[in-house]
């Protein structure tokens, strides 16, 4: 290829490169769209101010989160090692069984909104297994990397924060 051919080809190459870069940048979905779908729980930890981590729902917690396009969500987390009740009626557990259930399960649902600029999600909780959250608004910082969502929330009682890691369901 001589110099004249190269000079002619250079603008075409530059145009092609800019189109490829523009297309790649255009494929980055807004955070709200990246959040949509079903996620399974990886971990749910309390992180103290000194960095100490404690699993809130045990070593291998179970959970599912669902965020839909109309702005609704539901989140359920629980200990994987919960004992079964002695009888097969959920409303007739013993005091100890009911206590273990209350301490080993958290479910809440409502609507959500995303703030793209500060990477936060506001959860507008309509109902929760923990009654104090009914009607509450809670804000979480979130990060999305590939198929993983990490939510963090400040824990006022400990001075640390809660960190919940979710993975996109297959």
Residues covered by each model-derived region:
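Lipid interaction determinants
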Residues: 2, 8-170
């Amino acid at each position: 290829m001589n110099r004249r051919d190269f000079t002619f080809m250079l603008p075409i190459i530059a145009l092609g490169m800019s189109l490829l870069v523009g297309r790649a940048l255009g494929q980055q979905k807004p955070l709200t769209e990246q959040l949509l779908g079903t996620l399974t729980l990886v971990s749910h930890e309390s992180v103290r101010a000194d960095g100490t981590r404690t699993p809130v729902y045990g070593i291998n917690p179970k959970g599912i989160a669902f965020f839909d396009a109309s702005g609704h969500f539901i989140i359920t987390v629980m200990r994987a090692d919960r004992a079964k009740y002695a009888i097969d009626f959920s409303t007739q557990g013993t005091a100890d069984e009911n206590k273990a259930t209350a301490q080993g399960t958290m479910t809440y649902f409502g609507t959500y909104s995303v703030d793209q600029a500060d990477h936060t999600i506001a959860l507008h909780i309509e109902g929760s297994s923990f009654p104090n959250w009914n009607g509450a608004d809670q804000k979480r910082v979130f990060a999305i990397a590939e198929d993983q969502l990490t939510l963090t929330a400040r824990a006022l009682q400990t001075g640390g924060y809660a960190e919940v890691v979710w993975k996109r369901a297959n």
